[in-house]
Amino acid sequence: MRAILLLFDSLNRHCLEPYGCGWTQTPNFSRLAQHSVMFDRCYAGSLPCMPARRELHTGRYNFLHRSWGPIEPFDDSMPELLKKSGVYTHLISDHQHYWEDGGATYHTRYNSWECVRGQEGDPWKAHIGAVELPPHLGQANKQDEVNRAYIRGLGKQPLEKVFGLAHEFLNENRDADNWLLHIEPFDPHEPFFAPKEYQNRYSDDYNGTRFDWPPYDHVTEPLAAQVHCRNQYGALLT
């Protein structure tokens, strides 16, 4: 057995070219689709971060009896069962909720794991003193603002680092058998923070304050802001 599980957080199939989207540029997803079986009637049970992961590990619906949380001591975890059966399991992710209180105990089910830092409000880089947030619509986070200074530009994004580590794993273990590689980038989860080179592929008429982190609420922002925020999401997909 040699298997790769590729999981993107907050990925909407309606925004992918293989599923008929006309406003995004997703060439890598198109290449993947050419070598894949595409499902058009496959539905998730739980959609939030950790409930969805618990369903993935256990094969049971999470939303019926609990909310956002860790793997429970009584849960049977798929990667752990594989590990006990002699299949080497490895997780590569920048999904920072894996290593925070309340969301932990998933990554420890694998033989080994690599955590890429810097996404969302990950308490990664230290900054002693006040952090000034720029004018913005929607949400903003001071720790995220600190982190952004270290992940700007090509080659520095956590998403790129995750796939770099995946290539490293495959190169190191290309001749091995009996392994599961779980690759899980947090993108395109908000905030929609992509390099300028990709943002520039999506032009709009928005000239307001920063808007790349929409609130979990009814949409009340001006149409131009909505289009701009959607374009930031598209830049991450590209």
Task: Give the ranges of each region predicted by the language model.
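Catalytic domains that recognize anionic headgroups
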Residues: 1-238
